[in-house]
């Protein structure tokens, strides 16, 4: 083994170790904070403990989301912050509806308000914690919006489309994981409230959140993807005009389409990613049946 290879392997190993240690530290700190805030409340059932663990786990997911997309965020916010921040603000408002709606229609959802069940310390902690999560999710959605604007403003190039494809895939997957984790936490919140015997938090709420998050993902993802397909088609047609190409060019055309992600496999992966919140909600409801 050469010294360069050993150094590369050693560096990768240290990065992996530091990443695991960082994730563990974030989880431990959040778990201790949530546990401390929950002292003396009616949130002490096993279901509530699982819910508190999921809350801490979400913090790790959010930190990972920022780390994975940090380079793109810095680049975009320096060069063209308007579309990203504008879209992110709209997504924050949209996601905030999941926090506001239960309070507006509290009589239909709760016998007692959540803060009365959780206590002020835990309730306030969860409120601000979730708000941070909304901002992280919104920034990732803003990166997708920037990709959409970039496709509209610039003439398609191979390098540009490959970069856009990677961003769309990474951001969509990241946003899906964030929303599915939120669905899981909501499901265990519902079970915690039932265990406390203090409210009527219907399981249908979990399903409605899954449906809402799926619709939001589609609204964020579809316009950018449609423009990506349009730009990729334009580039392929410009390089291999349909009326002129022979068998060899047809194979090259197909290879280029595959490289750009215009395949059935990519379409299936995108469908799974965008539908993951509703799939997660259905699974949570099914697993939660007595």
Predicted regions and their residues:
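An N-terminal, globular interaction/scaffold subdomain
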Residues: 5-105
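Alpha-helical transmembrane segments
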Residues: 44-60, 119-141, 203-221
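Internal, hydrophobic cores of structured domains that mediate oligomerization or house catalytic pockets
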Residues: 62-179
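Membrane-helix interface motif
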Residues: 29-42, 97-116, 145-152, 181-197, ...
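Hydrophobic alpha-helical transmembrane segments and immediately flanking/interface helices
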Residues: 113-125, 190-210, 273-290
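Alpha-helical oligomerization segments
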Residues: 226-290
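A contiguous, surface-oriented mixed alpha/beta subdomain in the mid-to-C-terminal portion of proteins
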Residues: 165-233
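Loop-to-transmembrane boundary segments
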Residues: 6-25, 79-95, 158-181, 251-279
């Amino acid at each position: 083994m050469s010294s360069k290879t050993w150094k590369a392997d050693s560096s990768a190993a240290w990065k992996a170790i530091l990443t695991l240690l960082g994730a563990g530290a974030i989880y431990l700190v959040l778990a201790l904070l949530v546990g401390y805030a929950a002292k003396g409340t009616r949130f002490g059932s096993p279901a509530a403990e699982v819910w508190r663990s999921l809350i801490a786990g979400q913090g790790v997911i959010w930190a990972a989301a920022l780390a994975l997309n940090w380079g793109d965020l810095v680049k975009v916010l320096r060069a063209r912050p308007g579309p990203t921040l504008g879209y992110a603000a709209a997504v924050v408002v949209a996601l905030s509806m999941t926090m506001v709606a239960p309070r507006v229609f509290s009589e239909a959802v709760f016998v007692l308000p959540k803060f009365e069940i959780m206590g002020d310390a835990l309730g306030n902690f969860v409120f601000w914690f979730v708000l941070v999560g909304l901002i992280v999710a919104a920034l990732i959605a803003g990166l997708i919006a920037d990709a959409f604007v970039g496709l509209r403003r610039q003439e398609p190039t191979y390098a540009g489309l490959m970069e856009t494809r990677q961003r769309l895939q990474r951001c969509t997957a990241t946003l899906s994981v964030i929303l599915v984790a939120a669905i899981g936490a909501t499901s265990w919140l519902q079970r915690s409230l039932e265990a406390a015997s203090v409210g009527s938090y219907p399981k249908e709420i979990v399903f409605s959140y899954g449906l809402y998050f799926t619709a939001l993902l589609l609204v964020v993802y579809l316009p950018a993807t449609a423009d990506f397909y349009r730009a990729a088609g334009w580039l392929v047609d410009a390089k291999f005009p349909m009326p002129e190409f022979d068998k060899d060019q047809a194979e090259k055309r197909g290879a280029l389409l595959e490289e750009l992600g215009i395949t059935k496999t990519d379409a299936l992966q995108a469908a799974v990613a965008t539908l993951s919140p509703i799939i997660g909600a259905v699974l949570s409801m099914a697993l939660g049946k007595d």
